Amino acid sequence: VPHKTLNNNLRVSLLECRSAQQIRQKLYAALPAFSDIFPASKDAHILIKPNLNSNMNALTGNTTDLRLLEALLSYLRDQGYRVITIGEGTSSGFHREKINIFSRLCVDKLAKRFNAKLLDLNFAPYTHVGFEYGEKAAVARICTEADFFINLPKLKTHFEAGLSVCLKNMMGTLVGLPNKQKTHRSLFKNILNLNKFVKPHLHIVDGLIAMEGTGPSSGTPVKVDLVLIGTDPYLLDLVCAKIAGFEYKEIPYLMLAKEQGLITQEYLNFVEAFVPKEAIKPFKRPHVNMLVRFVNNPKWQYSFIKIRLSPIMNKLFSLKSFGTFLNATGLRQDVFDTQDLCLQQMCLETASCDNCKKCQAYCPVGLNLPEQLQPLHEQCIGCLYCFLVCPKKAIKIKGDLGFFKEQLKRYDAITRSIT
């Protein structure tokens, strides 16, 4: 569905994309329909906020796909925009352990190709948003002051919120862990409070490889092959819920938005008519054990968080052995490995390669693969997408895999099978 409007104002595009080439081609074709909201000045400051909440490769379904980010940066460059910042405020242990998510996901190398700046929103100058119970939380000021703000979320399930798409992605605009934790005193209301304050001009949803099951970091990837573009985060989240096979009443913050009048019956009618049946791919629902449900019960979750943020608990949570315990019990989804990946070389086992070109379809920077694998091309950013999708395991890595070992253990087989 190239483009439809609600009330001659709210616009939504639904694009089917199966390769890096199609993503770029269809994004270039779709974005002119939104040209009236783009800044007139080519010196306008444009902020892009992807979902980089973890160091997990986008093909696991966790983070924003670099193929989509590259296509967007390319489009903005070709339109003449010169001042671009990619900002993200990674949460929890990655922030605490000082793990550089931009580097681990190769966003730094991609940004360099387009002279885009990187900004860790956890350390940005801030303003304040009002939360429930009279609390104030710090929000990166750039998110309210940029001339044009593009939200670039991932479509994935979330064991607390049901789904994480446009509205939930704004959590990454909060400065530092304590401010992010403030949302949990009344999570669903505060998601809405945050979105009433921080209002991106455009939303581009990565539904290429989404995540189902126990997201946001322990689910499984699911191939959806969709990109959604729109101006209203409530409408887009409704569309994404429909695609994932959820009723809006199953998503607590969407049900609350309906109660507050942020979602009208007209929105619901639009979604029913807009989403084609062939686009609906019912996701597996999040499932957590009794301990996780107990700790995350809204009645006492905030009390647990206050205890968690005490100096003694901070020390305990930083211990590797305690982290292993948290992962084993399901209380923590992410693995905070401080050992970086050191990629020395990638090579092709020519006897195994059948030249299926799948590696080329997933390369964010458009290398002619597998030919340009040997030797490692100077334009390669080391994202390892080609390695992860090769069905014959013909692409080999040399170097210290570091944190990436754990991802391979969990996702190697399923990533190759779905792609």
Regions found by a protein language model. Name each.
Residues 1-356, 361-377, 382, 387, ...:
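N-terminal and secondary-structure boundary signal
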